[in-house]
């Protein structure tokens, strides 16, 4: 019952009702399917899921429980290549739904370029650049993700 985790469906008096297991299983399967994930067992323990499956489960839960904004802070860190692609595909599917804003925080230029429609680049808490993906070329993104002008300053300093 990973999907409901603290928000279980209960029928009967508050605190004394019965969990609606079949209904929770149905909803879990349905909601995961909406973002393209087919699960064999909605009761699979979280500990047996891959990192990508865990991230996808968290995203599906947020959508089901009414999130208007998903803030994804390095959602692919500590994942293998296959799991990274699984999570990125899920993010793209959510993006196509069109009713949820996604804030992706990443240090991975490739992932940013695959997902972003607009960028804001920070360095030490300061905005060093921003723009739409249609306005920024690959070199702009690379330069800003590596620290913008500050990286040039560092290069000069290291040459001294």
Residue ranges of predicted features:
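Glycine-rich phosphate-binding loops of nucleotide-dependent enzymes
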Residues: 1-160
